Amino acid sequence: MKMFKPLTATLFIIVTLVYAGYSQANISALGDLSKYRGFNYTPAGAVSPHHHIDQWVKYSAAVTNFDLDLAKRLNLNQVRVFVPYEAYLAIKDTLKDRLRHFVQACHIRGIGVMVVVGKGPWVQDTSQRPRAIEWVKFLSAALSSRPGLAMWDIMNEPDYPEKPLERVQRNFENCRFMSRLFREIDPKTPITIGMAFEKNMETLADYVDVLQFHDYSDTREKIDQTILRAKQFAAKAGKPVIDGEIGCIARANPYDVTLEEHMKAHVGWYIWELMIVRKGWGAVHGVFYEDGTVRDPSIAAAILGFFRNRNDILPAIVDREGAITRVIDDGNGWLAQQDADWKKGLDIAETAANLLEAGELAPMHVPPTWEVAQLRRGQPDVHALQNLIKKYLQALAPFKKPAEK
């Protein structure tokens, strides 16, 4: 058996530890990750498919500050933000200051920052790895000493899609390489990998300090099962675990449902995403429009821990005081007039719309009050108003109290 000399043996141990995933990261600085209330962030005005690049190339401190104030109002305390390598290539001279402003703006609001490191040409061509080294050195020099930086996410969803397998294996090898690289260049900042699937989170567990999975399951049972598996593996691995992406109305993963299950399970989470990005994922994701209004108030309520009662409910009786009966009578009377007053018709429509929304008697995909507001803003269109009132009266009719005998 060949014997190692003392120095050779020491170097062998060091190299082995690093390559096996040994970490010196300051995990304790992250605090209790079960209390993480996070969000993925892209400005509402970013444009797909290069929205994560444009976020930095067209960086606006004013927009950032406004959006982060919205997050603070919801008591959110973590953010996950993408920094593509292409942004570095585009604005190498100014990117550092923009990153620092973002992290500082988050820090003063009590929001920790997870930076998702964009992939580069080295993923497919390992001869390009010197560019990855340059990239990681840049990021570390820019942010590692800054208060507010929580962790590096070294690759987003390397396991999605799951086919072809060769692609996934290549991505996993990149994750191992980037993990070793970050641990060499910035050993104190924790590392995570945003895995699309919990099962794959387990595969690269040795290369992270914080386990991370994403979940958009379409039933509570599936959500709970995924969380349970993640927690069980995390306990076995002795590492904290978070869910880095939740919430998508197009995947039957309502924000209020998934948030409630994660809160009950005491697992930290990051919603996708804070802003409604009109030319990105905004049709199926997001809490706030660019002006600070919301599409669905139940999402904001759920983030604050207030959930819909789905057990012992008390259905609303909207016509308890005759409001539905009156607006139906008023509406039919207005419709019967030859020269009906435009403003009176709008008032009838608005009253009907308010009853529909307040009693949750109408779908909110297009809010009835929005339809009325559109008519108020435009030129008088009697035919459109007549059709709207007819639609509202028809929707209200089933909820009219029967006449007393």
Per-region residue spans from a language model:
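N-terminal carbohydrate-binding accessory modules
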Residues: S23-Q78, T192
